[in-house]
A protein has these predicted regions:
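Binding-site signature for planar aromatic cofactors or substrates
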Residues: 1-142
Length: 142
């Protein structure tokens, strides 16, 4: 089915759904991110899509400003599929979850990977530094 067929079948998006899309973080989205202890990050290298779960105690994603968030990448299975995808294609999509909350928050943006010691230090957990930090500039928030 193409877009016209789908729109004819489903109709237009509701005004409320269309209006909630923002280009940067607002106070509600910042609060949601700060309360989240789990997210899934989607990346694409031009050929393959990867969905990477990320979790730590709430507040593990640092909101630096309305147009910069940082996510520590801690050692795990070392597949680093998402990081490899970001190195080829900066576009990422995140969905944040909060336990027992039915609402989610989605953030799309452009990502870079940092191993700057000053950036890593902000993400220290129990004296352990992450290997890298994913820095995201949101382009769409809803």
């Amino acid at each position: 089915m193409d877009e016209i067929q789908l729109r004819n079948l489903y109709g237009p998006a509701t005004e409320k759904a269309s209006a909630k899309i923002m280009k940067s973080l607002d106070p509600h989205s910042v609060s949601f991110i700060n309360a989240s202890n789990f997210l899934v990050m989607g990346t694409f290298d031009g050929e393959d899509i990867d969905l990477s779960p990320k979790g730590d105690p709430k507040g593990f994603v640092k909101v630096i400003s309305d147009d910069r968030i940082e996510i520590a990448d801690r050692p795990g299975n070392n597949r680093i599929d998402g990081l490899l995808n970001i190195s080829k294609n900066a576009t990422v999509s995140l969905i944040f979850f909060i336990p027992k909350v039915t609402e989610t928050l989605r953030v799309q943006g452009k990502a870079t990977i940092s191993n700057d010691p000053k950036v890593l230090e902000k993400h220290k957990l129990k004296s352990n530094l992450p290997k890298t930090v994913i820095v995201i500039k949101p382009t769409k928030v809803f």
